Amino acid sequence: YTDYRKDRPMVAMWSQDWTLPEVPAKQYSDKLISDAKDFSDEAVITITRVGGEGADLPTNMKAKGITYNNNSKDYEDFKDGEHFLQLSQTERDMIDLVTKNFKKVTLVYNGANAFQFDFLSQYPQIKSVLWCPPAGQTGFSALGEVLAGDVNPSGKTSDTFAKDLTKTAVFNNTDGTAAGNASSVGTNGKFTYDNADDLTASYMGFSGDKVTVTPTFVNYVEGIYVGYKFYETAADEGLINYDDTVMFPFGYGLSYTTFKQEMGKVSYKNGKISFDVTVTNTGDKAGKDVVEVYYNPPYTDGGIEKASKNLVAFEKTKKLEPGASQTVKIEFDDDDMASYDQKDAKAYVLEQGDYDISIQSDSHHVIDHQKVTVKDTVTYNSDSNTHNGDAVAATNE
């Protein structure tokens, strides 16, 4: 398998080969599958994606300038309009083969970017998904310990996993191809300047074709509504059906055990909000849990832009044996709940009103909540009264 493709694809800043080397399913022999079933009644599937700051991921794998070599002459891995963060045909065929032969399957996703897991509902045999971002020097040893049950996972998702990435705000706001403004390199995120022709550059791509690029830019029209702040606010406003849109929320993560979190009385004194959370391991395996604290600020239609869910604090427990408890102390400043007013105050503002403070299992599911009331509006617009310890007061440029 390691010799399947010796010239491994590379994604770098100046040139990218997006090929996903994968053995076609028909090359898996009956004996190989039989031997695997004799070894274990559980199977592990690994899906991998590269991607970092060096290059934007393709929103259309068939776009001009995208270098990709299919794994078979019998079919194409991607159809026109399919993107890099969804299954290739070879991967889907492999999953079909594995799930036909195993009733218990774990899928490991090795990649830094949120993958499109909409296919999971089609495979009830896939019992669990493990997100393993770029693992570095020792990460895969840890992965083995988690899979074997020697280590109880306690991580949480650092992004929202959408069911259809093509319908997300960020996908559409950075997709130059969809807007008809794609540069000739054919990747996403590109709106070209119309006065920078003298800065155009050309180079030879992996495919041997000449690739021409020009300076580009992106319109960040989402404002503050990025990631979970968009999904939670959009759901609260009735813009989206959350369950139809989100696969895994921000801050979501499973364990081999179960926990109970109990929220103590919230205190608000001298600009500090504090309370205790008692976490109890209610399962039968030792493990750690994460306390996630969110706030929902008062909002006036047409006023300062605010998200309805905002992560303000989090703490992880020590390793708790079954039945054991730990009380976690939560404390944060009230100016952590301030919002930036770019229209009127042109500064951070902590508006008066009721703020909902909640402990949650992720960005969407509330365990318990209480209210704190800010009596007077505070505007952080002077060097003697800056927001959250800023050296100078933030303001519009």
Over which residues does each language-model region extend?
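C-terminal non-catalytic regions of proteins with extracellular/luminal or membrane-system context
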Residues: 1-397
